[in-house]
Amino acid sequence: SHDKPDHIRLFELKKDDLLISVHNA
């Protein structure tokens, strides 16, 4: 959805990347 501010969506993207990195470690 596009109802979130850009900085929130960016934060969530980075958070997802971190979770994926930890999961793949």
UniProtKB/Swiss-Prot annotation:
It comes from the Eukaryota. Its main location: secreted. GO terms for cellular component: extracellular region. It is found in: Secreted, Cell wall. Keywords: Cell wall, Secreted. The keyword Secreted applies. This is 44 kDa cell wall protein.
